[in-house]
């Protein structure tokens, strides 16, 4: 387990694909196109894809099939409520998820400092650099997700000030940082993002919508940009 964490620690940049819908077709297309890891969702309304994801029981058949067949690590967002998420953590681990992603203020204590699954600790715009320094130099988190954009700014173009914020968080973090595409990010931005110390880019609905063919095309373009990174 913890294959994503190993990738973040050993590769210059890792490409994670956040599926806009939990379908086997999309998952298979993502790993075949070159995704290094994929992420699914349960128990929440997703602000980027505008999709409501159901419970673990409602989605168990497709999730189990994805987990069984995927050659790359699969992670899951366990919800948007601490108590609800806490109630499914052990089952998600039993199912074989490699990492579990939650905002820090939704993450149950039971997900900290585990050996059997990685926690992907997401921060929003309310977390200060000083707080992140404490979090990422402790037992609390293993991977830091920079989900720092207010919802009303989703889909707006990446700008230079964003880079300064990614750099600030990466500089104080003792764990790998992962950037989700809340902003509109192009493959041509990958080098600048890597220069900020970010170790993974997670592309999703903001980049490719819900179209499978567009998703595949963007995965290939981002993977090419990653392969061309200058050290």
Roles of regions detected by a PLM:
Residues 148-198:
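Active-site/ligand-binding-proximal alpha/beta "capping" segment
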Residues 52-54, 112, 158-159, 207-231:
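C-terminal helical cap(s) of enzyme catalytic domains, especially alpha/beta-barrels
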Residues 2-4, 46-95, 102-113:
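N-terminal active-site wall of soluble small-molecule enzyme domains
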Residues 46-54, 133-167:
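Glycine/Thr-rich beta-alpha phosphate-binding loop at enzyme active sites
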Residues 7-25, 74-84, 118-127, 177-185:
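Active-site mouth loops of central-metabolism enzymes
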Residues 25-30, 83-94, 126-138, 183-201:
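Catalytic cores of alpha/beta
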Residues 37-48, 95-110, 143-153, 194-218:
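Glycine-rich phosphate-binding active-site loops on the catalytic face of alpha/beta enzymes
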Residues 1-72, 136-140:
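Conserved N-terminal beta1-alpha1 strand-loop-helix module at the mouth
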């Amino acid at each position: 387990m913890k294959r994503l964490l190993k990738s973040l620690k050993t590769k210059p940049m890792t490409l994670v694909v956040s599926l806009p819908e939990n379908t086997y077709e999309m998952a298979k297309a993502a790993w075949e196109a070159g995704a290094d890891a994929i992420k699914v969702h349960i128990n929440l309304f997703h602000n980027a894809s505008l999709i409501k994801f159901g419970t673990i029981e409602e989605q168990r058949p497709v999730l189990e099939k994805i987990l069984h067949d995927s050659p790359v690590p699969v992670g899951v967002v366990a919800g948007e409520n601490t108590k609800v998420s806490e109630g499914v953590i052990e089952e998600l681990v039993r199912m074989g998820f490699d990492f579990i992603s939650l905002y820090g203020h939704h993450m149950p204590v039971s997900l900290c400092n585990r050996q059997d699954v990685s926690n992907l600790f997401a921060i929003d715009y309310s977390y200060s650099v000083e707080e992140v320094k404490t979090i990422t130099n402790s037992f609390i988190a293993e991977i830091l997700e920079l989900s720092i954009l207010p919802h009303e700014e989703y889909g707006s173009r990446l700008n230079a000030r964003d880079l300064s914020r990614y750099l600030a968080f990466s500089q104080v973090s003792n764990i790998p940082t992962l950037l989700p595409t809340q902003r509109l990010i192009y493959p041509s931005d990958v080098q600048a993002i890597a220069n900020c110390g970010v170790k993974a880019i997670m592309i999703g609905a903001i980049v490719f919508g819900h179209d499978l063919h567009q998703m595949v095309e963007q995965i290939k373009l981002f993977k090419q940009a990653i392969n061309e990174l200058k050290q």
